[in-house]
UniProtKB/Swiss-Prot annotation:
<comment type="similarity">
    <text>Belongs to the bacterial ribosomal protein bS21 family.</text>
</comment>
<dbReference type="GO" id="GO:0006412">
    <property type="term" value="P:translation"/>
</dbReference>
<dbReference type="InterPro" id="IPR018278">
    <property type="entry name" value="Ribosomal_bS21_CS"/>
</dbReference>
<dbReference type="GO" id="GO:0003735">
    <property type="term" value="F:structural constituent of ribosome"/>
</dbReference>
<keyword id="KW-0689">Ribosomal protein</keyword>
<dbReference type="GO" id="GO:1990904">
    <property type="term" value="C:ribonucleoprotein complex"/>
</dbReference>
<dbReference type="GO" id="GO:0005840">
    <property type="term" value="C:ribosome"/>
</dbReference>
<protein>
    <recommendedName>
        <fullName>Small ribosomal subunit protein bS21</fullName>
    </recommendedName>
</protein>
<keyword id="KW-0687">Ribonucleoprotein</keyword>
<dbReference type="InterPro" id="IPR001911">
    <property type="entry name" value="Ribosomal_bS21"/>
</dbReference>
<dbReference type="InterPro" id="IPR038380">
    <property type="entry name" value="Ribosomal_bS21_sf"/>
</dbReference>
<dbReference type="Pfam" id="PF01165">
    <property type="entry name" value="Ribosomal_S21"/>
</dbReference>
């Protein structure tokens, strides 16, 4: 991952790098890899995430349609 530093503004470059890493899911991946996750736990977590995503999409769809 690469970020340009303009006018020696390192703080702005760090902020941009952190934003890019957040979008890419690097922090989330690091958090998940800190400890071993059993395959059954992984399946359960992914299923729960899918349910959460589906509910969120349904809420947004209903909000868009005006219900």
């Amino acid at each position: 991952m690469q970020v340009l530093v303009r006018d020696n503004n390192v703080d702005q470059a760090l902020k941009a790098l952190k934003k890019k890493m957040q979008r890419e899911g690097v922090f989330r991946e690091m958090k998940l890899r800190r400890h071993f996750e059993k395959p059954s736990e992984k399946r359960a977590r992914e299923a729960a995430e899918a349910v959460r995503r589906a509910r969120k999409m349904e809420r947004k769809r209903l909000e868009r349609e005006g219900f």
